Amino acid sequence: MEIHMTSIQELVINFHMTEACNYRCGYCYATWQDNSSDTELHHASENIHSLLLKLADYFFADNSLRQTLKYQSVRINFAGGEPVMLGSRFIDAILFAKQLGFATSIITNGHLLSTVMLKKIAVHLDMLGISFDTGDYLIAQSIGRVDRKKSWLSPARVLDVVTQYRALNPKGKVKINTVVNAYNWRENLTQTITQLKPDKWKLLRVLPVYSKEMTVLQWQYESYVHKHQVHADVIVVEDNDDMWQSYLMINPEGRFYQNAGACKGLTYSPPVLEVGVEEALKYINFNAEAFSKRYQSIHLPLAMSAGA
C-alpha cells in the first residue's frame, strides 16, 4: 500500500530537557556530543521560557512546515534523559508550555513519578508516556533499566502510576513505549498491556545511532510484534527506517538535532536562542513526508503500520 503525505492534526516537537537519568539503558541514544550539564537550559527558567516562546512564535504562525503538513496544533513532548529528575523546573516548563497554547506530553521511565508530582502535573498533561521494556527484573538489569540501588519499575508500579494519572485527568491519554532489543525480544507483555489499557503502545526497534549493541534482527523484531497481535488496535510499529529524520528533536542546550545515520551519531543546529527557529531548522535534515507517514500509519493494519 502506497502512503502519500497528507495533512496531520498535530505537530510534535520532542524537547529533551536533560541528559541526566537514573537509569543506564545500554541502547540509549539520548546523549549529545559536548553536552555539559552546566549548559542545559533548565538551569534558568527564563531560558526555557524563551525557547518555548520562540517555538510558539514560529510553529503557531504560518511557515513552510505548516504549509506542507497543514497541522492544526503543536505538542511539546518533554523527554530526557529523565525529565522528572528536574523537579520544579520540569513542572514549570509544562505549565508554561500549556499557558502558551501547546498540547503537552512527557516520556518518562516512571521511576520517580510520585503521587505528589502527578497531582501537580496530571491536569496539565495531555498525554503520559511511559518507557517500559520488560516485566522481568533480570531482563531490566541486563538492559540497564534499574537505578543505582538496583530498583526498577515493575508492572505493578506502572499500573499504579497509570491508574493515578487517569484518576487525576480522565481525559488524558496514556502511551507505552517499548524498545525491542536483544534482551527482551522473546518476552510476552500481553498480560501487562491488557491491564494498562494504553491508548497507544509504540514498539520501537532499537536504533543503532552510536553502535549496534543490543540490536535485533528483522525476524526477531517482527516476532515480538506478531506475538502481541491481540493488542493490534493500539500497537504502533516503528522500525529503524521509520525513525530516521522523522522526528523534530531539541537537545538540552536548545539545539535541533537529527540522527545522521546508522552508527554515525547526530547532527546539530546552532542554539535556537541565538539564531531563531527558522535558521536553526536549516541545519538539520527533517523529512516531513516521513513524519507524516508515521502519523498516517496509526490506523493501518498492524502488518503494514509504522510508528507514531
Curated annotation (Swiss-Prot):
Residue positions binding [4Fe-4S] cluster: C21, C25, C28
Record flagged with keyword rRNA processing: no
The keyword Signal belongs to this UniProt entry's keyword annotation: no
GO MF assignments: 4 iron, 4 sulfur cluster binding; lyase activity; metal ion binding
One Pfam entry name: Radical_SAM
Domain Radical SAM core intervals: 7-253
Enzyme class: lyase
Domain of life of the native organism: Bacteria
Keywords per UniProt: 4Fe-4S, Antiviral defense, Iron, Iron-sulfur, Lyase, Metal-binding, S-adenosyl-L-methionine
Enzyme nomenclature, EC number: 4.2.-.-
Reactions it catalyzes: CTP + AH2 + S-adenosyl-L-methionine = 3'-deoxy-3',4'-didehydro-CTP + 5'-deoxyadenosine + L-methionine + A + H2O + H(+); GTP + AH2 + S-adenosyl-L-methionine = 3'-deoxy-3',4'-didehydro-GTP + 5'-deoxyadenosine + L-methionine + A + H2O + H(+); UTP + AH2 + S-adenosyl-L-methionine = 3'-deoxy-3',4'-didehydro-UTP + 5'-deoxyadenosine + L-methionine + A + H2O + H(+)
Cofactor: [4Fe-4S] cluster
GO biological process: defense response to virus
The family this protein is said to belong to: Belongs to the radical SAM superfamily. Viperin family.
Role according to the record: Expression of pVip58 in E.coli (strain MG1655) confers resistance to phages lambda, P1 and T7; delays culture collapse upon infection with T7. Catalyzes the conversion of cytidine triphosphate (CTP) to 3'-deoxy-3',4'-didehydro-CTP (ddhCTP), guanosine triphosphate (GTP) to 3'-deoxy-3',4'-didehydro-GTP (ddhGTP) and uridine triphosphate (UTP) to 3'-deoxy-3',4'-didehydro-UTP (ddhUTP), probably via a SAM-dependent radical mechanism.
Miscellaneous information on this protein: How this protein allows bacteria to resist viruses that do not encode their own RNA polymerase (such as lambda, P1) is unknown.
The protein's name in its UniProt record: S-adenosylmethionine-dependent nucleotide dehydratase
Organism this protein belongs to: Pseudoalteromonas ulvae
Gene: vip58
